[in-house]
């Protein structure tokens, strides 16, 4: 699949890439092993979620946002309102600086996810945790539409384990950046009694 991205968005994403690389020297935002392939591994990996967002005039919450992936990338790509939840104050300082690259509204929340009460249309996360942990952490977050979760090779095990405690619908989409990568589109999440 080829993604057509307007030049002005590419330019902003390039600025974001430079900022992440600069800050990564002092606070660990992304693995050093991925810096050489940053555009493919991080920018495109995050940007591919935009194809599953029909209406960009929404509120999207990104949990464990540390490096701004995918939240800031999706904001730059046109999502109107993004909240980035990150517990590490140093990473929040980075996110505050990076948020200025986007023309859209970005809110940085420096708290643990479990303590946040917020509602959104879509919730995202990348390299955060397994499904059970994600679902347990977001008890106070109301997700009206769906979750878009970037997952790796253990996604099926995560689904099976989560299905023991939770009811939810899901679609599995192939990542365009990694053969083992998947995008889980989760909806109608309810905890089993």
Swiss-Prot record:
The keyword Methyltransferase applies. It is found in: Cytoplasm. One of its GO terms (cellular component) is cytosol. Keywords: Cytoplasm, Methyltransferase, rRNA processing, S-adenosyl-L-methionine, Transferase. Specifically methylates the N7 position of guanine in position 527 of 16S rRNA. NCBIfam families: rsmG_gidB. This is Ribosomal RNA small subunit methyltransferase G. It comes from Rickettsia massiliae (strain Mtu5).
């Amino acid at each position: 699949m080829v993604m057509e991205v307007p030049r002005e968005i590419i330019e902003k994403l390039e600025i974001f890439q430079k900022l992440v690389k600069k800050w990564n020297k002092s606070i660990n935002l992304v693995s050093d092993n991925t810096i050489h392939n940053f555009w493919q591994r991080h920018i495109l990996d995050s940007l591919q979620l935009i194809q599953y967002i029909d209406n960009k005039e929404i509120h999207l919450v990104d949990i464990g946002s540390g490096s701004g992936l995918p939240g800031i990338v999706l904001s730059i790509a046109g999502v109107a309102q993004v909240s980035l939840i990150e517990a590490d104050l140093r990473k929040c300082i980075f996110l505050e600086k990076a948020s200025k690259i986007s023309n859209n509204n970005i809110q940085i929340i420096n708290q643990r996810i479990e303590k946040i009460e917020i509602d959104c249309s879509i919730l995202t996360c990348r390299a955060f945790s397994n499904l059970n942990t994600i679902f347990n952490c977001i008890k106070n977050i109301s997700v009206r539409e769906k979750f878009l979760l970037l997952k790796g090779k253990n996604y099926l095990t995560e689904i099976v384990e989560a299905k023991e405690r939770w009811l939810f619908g899901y679609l599995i989409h192939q990542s365009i950046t990694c053969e083992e990568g998947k995008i889980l589109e989760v909806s109608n999440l309810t905890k089993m009694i």
